Amino acid sequence: MKIKKSILVKSELLKLNRGNAKLGKNIWTFSLPAGFSCPGALECLSKANRDTGKIADGPNTKFRCFAASDEAQYKNTRNQRWHNFELLKGKSSEQMVKLIQDSLPQKASLIRIHVSGDFFNQNYFDAWVEVARKNPGRTFYAYTKSLHFWLARKDEIPENLALNASHGGTHDWLIEKYQFKSAKVVFSEKEAEEKGLKIDHDDSLAYHSRDSFALLIHGTQPAGSLASKALSALRKLGWTGYSRKAKIAVAMLFLSFSLVPDKYWSPWVREGMENIFPKLKYFGQGIV
């Protein structure tokens, strides 16, 4: 059954975007201001001032929220997220359902709820649950530290809404107690291996798997922090992040490795390439 949309001008609608270099263009994303809409944030709590963009980290911040860094750098990003937040605040769950429904692009079949931000109250969480229920042909997914809202509706989550508990919040104890599928930020591949977790590089484990997983630290981190040191170590190993430029660089390396005959590679270079490229091959997909 098609959902009839109200006729609204763009300024009255929420703003969604196509996925970035990490996620791919098949994923649509929705965001709110980092920190300001995250009642469960603790270890990643960071906020970019709405007017100036200046970053303020929370007292317990261990790694800076990458979304707050984006807002600090890009005023348009900051403005868009506050636009969405202002439209939603103060509305009933039913009003939010209507607003979200009216704002969803017709072609959007895979939607990430919150590249930035989180479920800021129970009514808002309930609204997304209902939107997912009204759109069985679409897949929705989210990372969240608002586990108390999830717990309140634990038995009412539709199959097409994939929730991932994000470690490092004020309600972490609920993850183990209720066996929520979860995502944990790690500082190295070795740490992920020690925890028995696969690293998700493109969100596919977030929306397609039922198992918990890890996310590799990225973004801009506070100088001198453990997260900053871990990021520096990763870069020394060749990790360049998720930007399109990084994808192109890896893709070109992979193409060169594939085309150059074996006789032109020394044995130790060949062995090193064969060890690293299985981990990086996914990263150039869609570029070459």
Task: Spell out what each predicted region is.
Residues 1-288:
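Class I S-adenosyl-L-methionine
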